[in-house]
Every structure is written in structure tokens, then in C-alpha cells.
């Protein structure tokens, strides 16, 4: 048993530690808040090539505690929460049969650009269903990503209808596959993370609006910081095990902080006057719909929980509001101001009495 575990540890590809990543604080914060509260709705990360987008996203999964699942279940079903459980397991539970469980690492699923709809959603064996009357379902990537993270690199190059499917599943928490009158559904609640380079094309505004947060990252200009980043990467490439060991304490501290924030989240309160001001900011920025208001409220609570507070302060809102609103503003070709700066300016104006 021990030798097998040792072999498995040796064969696992080392992941660059999250806490060793230098700079890019906005991207790191967006990922942490989505992990604390997946209902924020995922994050879109846009930035230059070679700025550590993929490295950071893959590193976040390493910070998450193991999750309890129904053993040998195709959908990583939760053993008690019916909203995160397949219909088959739900029926087993209702029949009074105990479910066998096991612990697994939080799934981190990569969605390749060339993926088909069947690969994403899963397929039903129509022939078997018609001839033998057996509903056979081959799970797709959405099933594997349930209760985990689904990462789409170059999401701006993915087919729009696939992005739609991902966003629908992420919002509803369920994936339904229908073929020839036969229907199968399963839980598909995950944190959707997309990344891309704006030079290669933008997402449609309707799709962009569905992402909870939008982080923009730039190439680091400070020479000292660049040298530090190069050193960190060189150390990791030369001796990944040692680099991981050196960061073990900071990794564990952050892991504990995230776990505590997840427990604290449901008790966080946000005063009515602060909620009014959030909606005032959204109104003044002419944000369509109410997604901006909802996500900003959620993100502010997650940020307060991350800092171990019971109540949301205006400074907490200031830290997250740009991430939540910058991609929801209408594009104005004559506007000289960056959308993030515009959000911050309106926030400062409305919250100035408290600052």
C-alpha cells in the first residue's frame, strides 16, 4: 500500500506553487474568491502571452482540500447534498441504502479547443437504448468537472455555442443531454475559468457578461520583479520538489485560510446602505441587467470571509468591484479611459462619504 502511494507521488507531475507566483495579484484574488464561493460565476482572465495565466490557474487546484465523493461515481457526486448528486444516487439514498464514499483531489479539467459538443456534454448510446431498453450514458468533460474547476485556454477562440453550453451548466449546476427523445441529466457545478489573449479576438459581450469576474493582466515592467520571476521559475525547473517543499508552509497557510473562509461565508452580512451603493455604481455605469449587482455582493462577502471578518466594509467592495463590473460596460470607441479605471472612479465618487 505504502509503495503504491509512493509510486503515485513520484509519477504526479509537479505543479508550480501558487504562493511562489510573483505579482498578478488581481488574477490570484479572482481565482481565490471563486474557490471560496463558486456561485460568483467563474473568471475570465485576459492578458499578454507568457504572463503566467495557465500556470496560476493550474496552481490554484493544488490549494484545495480533498472532497468526499460517492465511490466509483462518474459525476463526483456528493454523498449528502442532493443538488450535487446524480439521480441514481439520489434514488439509492431514498431507498435507505447507504452510499460508499471516498476522498479525491478537486478535479481540474482542461477543455481542448477542438472539443466537440459530445465530448463536452457526454453521449447517449441510442442503439442500446432502442434495442435493449438500457439508458447508457458516456460522460463528458462536464461530468468530470463537477465540484471542481473547468479550465478553457484561449476561450475567445472556442465556438460560441460551446461557450454557451459551459456557461449554462456553470450557472444552473446541471447538464442535460437529450437525443432522440431520451434524456439524461447529471450535476455539473464547477468553477469556470477562461483565459485568452485580447489580440486574438474578444468574446461576444453577451458571453462575457456571463462570467462573474474579468481579470486583466499585463506583462511586468519592473526589472527587479522580472528578475525575481525568472529566478523563481529557474529554481522550479531545476528542482521542482525542493521549490514545492520551500513553499509548503505558505501553501498550507493559504489552504487553511481558504477553508476557513468557506466555512465563514454563510455568516457574512452586508449592510443595506452598502448594497444600495453597489447598485448606484452599477446604475451610473449603465450596466445592463442585475448580474453585476449580484456578483459584486457575492464577491464582497467572499473577500470579507477571506479576511476573517463578519461584516462587509466599503473597502472590501472597493477591492472586488472592478473585477466584477469592468467587462459589463458598454464599449465606447471614443472613450479614452480604461473600463477598470472608469469603475474605480465611479466607485470613489459614490463611496466617498465613507472613505
From Swiss-Prot:
Catalytic reaction equation(s): protoporphyrin IX + Mg(2+) + ATP + H2O = Mg-protoporphyrin IX + ADP + phosphate + 3 H(+)
Subcellular location as annotated: Plastid, Chloroplast
Record family assignment: Belongs to the Mg-chelatase subunits D/I family.
Binding-site list for ATP: 47-54
GO molecular function list: ATP binding; ATP hydrolysis activity; magnesium chelatase activity
Main localization category: plastid
NCBIfam families according to UniProt: BchI-ChlI
Keywords annotated in UniProt: ATP-binding, Chlorophyll biosynthesis, Chloroplast, Ligase, Nucleotide-binding, Photosynthesis, Plastid
Pathway the protein contributes to: Porphyrin-containing compound metabolism; chlorophyll biosynthesis
InterPro entries according to UniProt: AAA+_ATPase (IPR003593), CHLI-like (IPR045006), ChlI/MoxR_AAA_lid (IPR041628), Mg_chelatase_ATPase-isu (IPR011775), Mg_chelatse_chII-like_cat_dom (IPR000523), P-loop_NTPase (IPR027417)
Any one GO BP annotation for this protein: chlorophyll biosynthetic process
Name of this chain's protein: Magnesium-chelatase subunit ChlI
Gene3D superfamilies named in the record: Magnesium chelatase subunit I, C-Terminal domain, P-loop containing nucleotide triphosphate hydrolases
Gene: chlI
UniProt enzyme class: ligase
One GO term describing the cellular component: chloroplast
Function: Involved in chlorophyll biosynthesis; introduces a magnesium ion into protoporphyrin IX to yield Mg-protoporphyrin IX.
Disulfide links within the chain: none
EC number: 6.6.1.1
Amino acid at each position: 500500500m505504502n509503495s503504491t502511494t509512493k509510486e503515485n507521488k513520484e509519477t504526479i507531475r509537479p505543479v508550480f506553487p501558487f504562493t511562489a507566483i510573483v505579482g498578478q495579484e488581481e488574477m490570484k484574488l479572482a481565482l481565490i474568491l471563486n474557490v471560496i464561493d463558486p456561485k460568483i460565476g467563474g473568471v475570465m482572465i485576459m492578458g499578454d502571452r507568457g504572463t503566467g495565466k495557465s500556470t496560476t490557474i493550474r496552481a490554484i487546484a493544488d490549494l484545495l482540500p480533498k472532497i468526499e465523493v460517492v465511490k466509483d461515481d462518474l459525476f463526483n457526486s456528493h454523498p449528502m447534498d442532493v443538488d450535487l448528486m446524480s439521480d441514481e444516487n439520489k434514488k439509492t439514498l431514498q431507498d435507505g441504502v447507504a452510499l460508499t464514499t471516498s476522498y479525491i483531489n478537486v478535479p481540474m479539467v482542461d477543455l481542448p479547443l477542438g472539443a466537440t459538443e459530445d465530448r463536452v456534454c457526454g453521449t447517449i448510446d441510442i442503439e442500446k437504448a432502442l434495442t435493449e431498453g438500457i439508458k447508457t450514458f458516456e460522460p463528458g468533460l462536464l461530468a468530470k468537472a463537477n465540484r471542481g474547476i473547468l479550465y478553457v485556454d484561449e476561450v475567445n477562440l472556442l465556438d460560441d455555442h460551446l461557450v454557451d453550453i459551459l456557461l449554462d451548466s456553470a450557472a444552473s449546476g446541471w447538464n442535460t443531454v437529450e437525443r432522440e427523445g431520451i434524456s439524461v441529466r447529471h450535476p455539473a457545478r464547477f468553477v469556470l475559468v477562461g483565459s485568452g489573449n485580447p489580440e486574438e479576438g474578444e468574446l461576444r459581450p453577451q458571453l462575457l457578461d456571463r462570467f462573474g469576474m474579468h481579470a486583466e493582466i499585463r506583462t511586468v515592467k519592473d526589472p527587479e520583479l522580472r528578475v525575481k520571476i525568472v529566478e523563481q521559475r529557474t529554481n522550479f525547473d531545476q528542482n521542482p520538489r525542493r521549490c514545492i517543499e520551500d513553499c509548503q508552509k505558505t501553501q498550507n497557510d493559504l489552504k487553511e485560510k481558504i477553508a476557513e473562509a468557506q466555512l465563514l461565508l454563510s455568516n457574512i452580512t452586508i449592510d443595506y446602505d452598502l448594497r444600495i451603493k453597489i447598485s448606484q455604481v452599477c446604475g451610473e455605469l449603465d450596466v445592463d441587467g442585475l448580474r453585476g449587482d449580484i456578483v459584486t455582493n457575492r464577491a464582497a462577502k467572499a473577500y470579507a470571509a477571506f479576511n476573517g471578518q463578519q461584516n462587509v466594509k466599503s473597502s472590501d467592495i472597493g477591492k472586488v468591484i472592478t473585477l466584477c463590473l469592468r467587462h459589463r460596460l458598454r464599449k465606447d470607441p471614443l472613450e479614452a479611459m480604461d473600463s477598470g479605471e472608469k469603475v474605480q472612479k465611479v466607485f470613489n465618487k459614490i463611496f466617498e462619504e465613507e472613505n
